Amino acid sequence: MQNSTCQAVGECRVPEHAVLPQPLYREVVQFIESLPQKEGHLVTVLHKAQSVFGYLPIEVQQFVADHMEVPLAQVYGVVSFYTFFTMVPKGKYPISVCMGTACFVKGADKVVHAFKEQLKIDIGDVTPDGRFSIDTLRCVGGCALAPIVMVGEKVYGNVTPGQVKKILAEY
């Protein structure tokens, strides 16, 4: 662990200038300590960290690197390689539109456009109130329901641009 970047807080070492809440760091440390071994579990730990923090900024990546005893470059390499990891904050209700072949052919691009118009943001952005963000996915494996939209973990199938306003109203 790099003492120059961490400050002791109970059983957990958080970055000295941590912007994110300290209890969240403790949750990640407890998860790491529950593993039978650290080796081979970096992706699992990053999933946990992202579920706890909502995203993986460099501060969290350094924290994970320190506690997993791996170089920051290795953590960054994993985070930047896999598309399910994000280094930027998402909205409270992240919207993901599938752009796989079946979804695209059935109008997913028009659905994306409708979300962008309703929320007045672009892909990758977050609404000013922090409620929504929009991203696209390659394929979610539900081609029979194309086009598919996910809001958080909730899946919507056969979505049309006309349904976008109703979907947003649920949140």
From Swiss-Prot:
It is an enzyme of class 1 (oxidoreductase). Catalyzes the reduction of NADP in the presence of molecular H(2) to yield NADPH. It comes from Solidesulfovibrio fructosivorans (Desulfovibrio fructosivorans). The gene is hndA. The keyword NADP applies. GO terms for molecular function: 2 iron, 2 sulfur cluster binding; hydrogen dehydrogenase (NADP+) activity; metal ion binding. It catalyses: H2 + NADP(+) = NADPH + H(+). Heterotetramer composed of HndA, HndB, HndC and HndD subunits. HndA and HndB could form a heterodimeric intermediate in the electron transfer between the active site of hydrogenase subunit HndD and the NADP reduction site of the reducing subunit HndC. It comes from the Bacteria. Gene3D superfamilies: Glutaredoxin (3.40.30.10), NADH-quinone oxidoreductase subunit E (1.10.10.1590). Optimum pH is 8. Its EC number is 1.12.1.3. Keywords: 2Fe-2S, Iron, Iron-sulfur, Metal-binding, NADP, Oxidoreductase. Inhibited by oxygen. This is NADP-reducing hydrogenase subunit HndA. Its cofactor is [2Fe-2S] cluster. SUPFAM superfamilies: Thioredoxin-like (SSF52833). Binds 1 [2Fe-2S] cluster.
